[in-house]
Amino acid sequence: MQAFHSNWTRPFFIRNPHMEYRIEPFELLTTALSALEWRRENGSIRMICDTPAKRYYESLGLCFLWDDGVYPLLDTMPEDINATAFWAAGKLYALSAVPSPCVMLDTDFICWKSISNLLDGPDTAAIHREDITPSIYPEQTAFAKTEGFPLDSFDWTVQPFNTALAYFGNDEFRRYYTDTAIRFMRCSPDADDTLTYMVFAEQRLLSMCAEKKHARAAALSDLPALFGGAQNGYFTHIWGFKQQMRENPELYEDFCRRCAARLQKDFPEESKTIANIAELSPFFA
């Protein structure tokens, strides 16, 4: 199964206009685990990014993580995409360039086992459904900055998907979803909320589009199973743990050391290369 990571750096440079691009150590380590475990268990993986991201990975010697290559396709993303509100827009543009069947995978999401048996049947699948929490997934009236997009043509009762991992087995549906999500973003250049607009475009529209097109859609897990261990060791998603680590240096270091130890155990040769990176080497000591 073909998978891809993505990395669009424009949001970073909007937040940090005078900084050199960098990725935190724990994110580099989870990126390595995500790519290498995918290759071992599920197939090939590529990185779709922009030139600053590619140069950064090259400078660290990490391009080998993606056996299918590193492609700066996101250099061509339109300038009118609001990169503050739509900070993950690069994922959707990357998906628009990858034919089905494919898996869209976040760099902080790790598949420890083969998932081919879970993907037999659906046109699209994602890691889990999300509750319609009003502060995250508000009603249609919250999108006052969106003009020219048919918000009222969708079913607002359908639970959104979390797309840390998303599978697209039907190419017609993949194109419909990405076209719809990109259209929404381009109809919202003045979007003024950094959460609700993005998760609508990426996560809520996926389930809405599936409902509208009568596509077969599946959730591969659920939140209690994902974070309680009941999903039999298939998945790890770091997302909810990031802020805790940033606030607790001991937790941060312990996590990085555990990632390094797992890399050394599962990928002894590759881990030697990763351990040579200056900002990562202390965690391999």
Task: Pin down the residues of each PLM region.
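N-terminal anchoring/stem segment of glycosyltransferases
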Residues: 1-78, 241-285
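A conserved donor-nucleotide-binding helix/loop in the catalytic core
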Residues: 26-28, 32-34, 76-104, 112
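Short glycine-/acidic-enriched loop or helix-start segments at secondary-structure transitions
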Residues: 57-59, 104, 113-116
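Short acidic donor-binding/metal-coordinating loop in glycosyltransferase active sites
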Residues: 107
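Conserved donor-nucleotide/metal-binding helix-loop-beta segment in metal-dependent transferases, i.e.
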Residues: 111-147
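Short, flexible, basic/aromatic active-site loop/helix in glycosyltransferases
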Residues: 144-156
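Catalytic core and acceptor-binding pocket of nucleotide-sugar-dependent glycosyltransferases
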Residues: 156-246
